[in-house]
């Protein structure tokens, strides 16, 4: 019996740290293969999937800025880090015979296609996995904001936020506070008012204004992407 997706089109947001695994830096080949297998499994269902990968496993713009670098330069370096991650994920997906396209906000024709909204949608309609890289092409904006913007542009039904060190949204850091409560459901306004660190406030406000749901869950548990796509109750669901 064919497995049915709850959503027609999803955006999967992965932090760069999720690809690093326990090492905290670089790309862990075991982790990226696991993520690719999960994404490929979803792509075979009746669900179109786009992926946005952060670059924190290689470089963080804020880190460079804190060290005295020009913030714009540091952020552009971070965008290039996301391209490295995107190409690594594309390679892992193509090894699984999963048709994949990388689209970058900064033009680099030799390695990827330039981001064009209509082209991205067409790739999704053709059941290709689309990986968005290089953020939105401007400094001062996070990859969380990229996920929110691209989800609105391609009219995704939900943003799936795969985390590497937490299995949902908590009232406090569960590693520090033993009394921290895990939320099964939140609203965007609650998330903003309570200062819950799901994504930055720019991205959170954008999701609220454009009525984009979020599902926050652990990427480290095998099969969780598929479970989220099928509508199983995992992690924390955030809606308007």
Swiss-Prot record:
Residues 21-26 are annotated as: Involved in allosteric activation by GTP. Pathway: Pyrimidine metabolism; CTP biosynthesis via de novo pathway; UDP from UMP (UMPK route): step 1/1. One of its GO terms (biological process) is 'de novo' CTP biosynthetic process. It is found in: Cytoplasm. ATP binds at residues 13-16, 56, 60, 164, 170, 173. Its main location: cytoplasm. Coiled coil: none annotated. Its EC number is 2.7.4.22. Transmembrane segments: none annotated. Allosterically activated by GTP. Inhibited by UTP. It comes from the Bacteria. Keywords: Allosteric enzyme, ATP-binding, Cytoplasm, Kinase, Nucleotide-binding, Pyrimidine biosynthesis, Transferase. One of its GO terms (molecular function) is UMP kinase activity. Signal peptide: none annotated. UMP binds at residues 55, 75, 136-143. GO terms for cellular component: cytoplasm. It catalyses: UMP + ATP = UDP + ADP. Homohexamer. Belongs to the UMP kinase family. Catalyzes the reversible phosphorylation of UMP to UDP. This is Uridylate kinase. The lineage of its organism: Bacteria, Bacillati, Bacillota, Bacilli, Bacillales. The gene is pyrH.
């Amino acid at each position: 019996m064919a497995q049915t997706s709850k959503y027609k089109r999803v955006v999967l947001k992965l932090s760069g740290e999720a690809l690093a695994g326990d090492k905290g830096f670089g790309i862990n080949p075991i982790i990226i293969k696991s993520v690719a297998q999960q994404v490929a499994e979803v792509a075979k269902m009746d669900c179109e999937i786009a992926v946005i990968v952060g670059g924190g496993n290689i470089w963080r713009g804020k880190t460079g800025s804190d060290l005295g670098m020009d913030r714009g330069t540091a952020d552009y370096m971070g965008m290039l880090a996301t391209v490295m991650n995107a190409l690594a994920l594309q390679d892992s997906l193509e090894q699984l015979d999963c048709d994949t396209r990388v689209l970058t906000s900064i033009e680099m024709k030799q390695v990827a296609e330039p981001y064009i909204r209509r082209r991205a949608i067409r790739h999704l309609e053709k059941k290709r996995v689309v990986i968005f890289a290089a953020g939105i092409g401007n400094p001062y904006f996070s990859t969380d904001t990229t996920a929110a913007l691209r989800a609105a542009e391609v009219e995704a039904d939900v943003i799936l936020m795969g985390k590497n060190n937490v299995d949902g949204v908590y009232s406090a850091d569960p590693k520090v506070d033993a009394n921290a409560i895990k939320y099964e459901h939140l609203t965007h306004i609650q998330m903003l008012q309570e200062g819950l660190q799901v994504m930055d406030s720019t991205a959170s406000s954008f999701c609220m204004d454009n009525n984009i749901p979020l599902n926050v869950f652990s990427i480290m548990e095998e099969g969780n992407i598929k479970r989220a796509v099928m509508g199983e109750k995992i992690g924390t669901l955030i809606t308007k």
